Amino acid sequence: MGNRINIKKYKFLHWIYNLIHYKSLSHNKAAYKKYAIHRPVIASISSRNFPDKESKAWLDKGHSRELVPHKAGFSHFPDTIRRQLLTWSDNGYIILESYFDETATSCILGEIERLVNRHKLHPAPDNNKLMFANRLSAPIREITYDQRLTDLLSFLLDKEVVPFQTINFVHGSNQRAHSDSIHMTTYPLGYLIAVWIALEDTNPDNGPLFYYPGSHRLPYLLNSDFNEGTTLLTVGKKNYGDYEDRIAALIREKELKKEVFLAKKGDILIWHANLIHGGLPVRDPGLTRKSMVIHYYAKDVIKYHEITERPSLLK
């Protein structure tokens, strides 16, 4: 059979695809101008094209305990949220129990079942991710714009947020530790935020979510740290496993402590763009772990995908 050619590594194919979807890149045109990035919006983009690799988010530059009590809107949040806002700079996450009620979680589950049965939503071939249901379902899209939630996320980033994607899981992800910012990246760094929603109870056997408190304070691990071989026409030669190995080494080096989120249906976990997290191995393959992740970008920043060097398409 010989060696198979990986055509996805060729950037010119990305450029053609981006040109076809040019309207979905309009969000970056104003941001490129704002940050003086002189580059076509259809072109490949990575951290190499920016002048720095530092987060500019206000709660990364300063400490939440000192800053958030003085910000307009802080007093409007419930006490359970205010307490966790104060520790955001230390922890990099917020847990809200029973945030979504039975009506909301059943709505999401029903919509996913409907889309799968109608063959409008298909799991990725190498995992069980169901991508972008928010683009296919008005009820799910409405949930991504939940006003209480977007108000909180906008407060955390000090910028208006916009939902980029949803990922639905039927089973546990079995995903190794990673930071979302290798997949969905911003310039300046720090302007992505994620919300994980438990659509059923989790337990030690169905592959619960894990995370490393405080890991968001580590330097961002970007292509230049592991993805050697990028050229003008091709992306780097290393694969995603190399990135995961670097994260694993970093966890050992820094002696990070793992926390496991044994969530109940309706609970949510909000995490920082750079918080290291993943999914524990599924001990019982017969069990489901239904959940949905929503990734949000801040509205007025450059949005792209570091690992593939492609600009984000917002539809």
Residue ranges and their predicted role:
Residues R82-R148, N174-A177, L209-Y211, R217, ...:
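Non-heme Fe(II)/2-oxoglutarate
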Residues M1-T87:
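Fe(II)/2-oxoglutarate
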Residues F100-E102, F169-V170, T202-P204, H216-R217, ...:
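Short, solvent-exposed loop/turn segments at secondary-structure junctions
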Residues D245-K315:
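Catalytic core of Fe(II)/2-oxoglutarate
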Residues D205-L275:
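Double-stranded beta-helix
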Residues V116-K120, L157, N203, A273, ...:
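A generic secondary-structure signal for well-formed alpha-helical elements
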Residues D126-S137, R148-L218:
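Conserved double-stranded beta-helix
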Residues I95-L96, V195-I197, L269-W271:
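Short hydrophobic-aromatic micro-motifs
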